[in-house]
């Protein structure tokens, strides 16, 4: 086994200067569960990429990702989380997950405030739905708080569009499990309150509209020769193009962190996104070279990647071990 590098960010404040107590304890990236196109590439030829749904396996992975998220949060009752894990994870040994390294919960303060950013692609929204269902179940069992059935997050709604309830505190593209949506019960212990935002900048890399499987096989061979980061798909994007979207979104995050200095900061920020976007996000944040980016292979569906704030060094540390192409680290994908 080769020694894994520890990835530490150089600057958590971006170009907005240093600030304290305004940054989330964790930044978590979650890849969507298995989609129909992960199972059968032919669907890319007749279903728009943004409308591809999860498979039944992907729906299971979405709920398991909810368990994995709860496991890294500072919650009231970790035993309750493990009880839920027994319900949603039948065989831990059969799962393809990413290991955590040196995650010791540097802060023990309870996590009660989460913001989710989701790719608007259907498979990402459906993954988020599975995650939120698990959190809602934890909230109901732990603190007696239940969300009204007709006010739960719905990734579909009518036709192509998600359903976004519009309460007093809600605007288009934002969903909250706030007091407007609570049907019964009062917070008894730690009530995990969350906010959901649709964010087009964290969408999948554009592979070029409808994709015929035979032609895409040839394109993929060319990409392998050219290089995964700079190769641009016909009528689509390169990973370098995705990098530009990542840079824009991270600047938005830094502004949000800065603006929350006068208010309670988010305890946890979660991005429900895609495999390539997740790796490019980490590349930009930790300032990897393109060669370092290309050394990492894709993460399994439903994977949870954890960045933890280490206030002693004023930096975020990547606590998840990512899989690489090299043989000595090949076992990290299991």
From Swiss-Prot:
GO terms for biological process: intracellular sterol transport. The modification Phosphoserine is found at residue 248. It is an enzyme of class 3 (hydrolase). GO terms for molecular function: acid phosphatase activity; phosphatase activity. One of its GO terms (cellular component) is cytoplasm. The active site is at 32 (tele-phosphohistidine intermediate), 126 (proton donor/acceptor). Optimum pH is 4.5. Active from pH 4 to pH 5.5. Its main location: cytoplasm. It comes from the Eukaryota. The keyword Cytoplasm applies. Its EC number is 3.1.3.-. Present with 3170 molecules/cell in log phase SD medium. Metal-independent, broad-range acid phosphatase. Involved, either directly or indirectly, in the bidirectional transport of sterols between the endoplasmic reticulum and the plasma membrane. Belongs to the phosphoglycerate mutase family. This is Broad-range acid phosphatase DET1. It comes from Saccharomyces cerevisiae (strain ATCC 204508 / S288c).
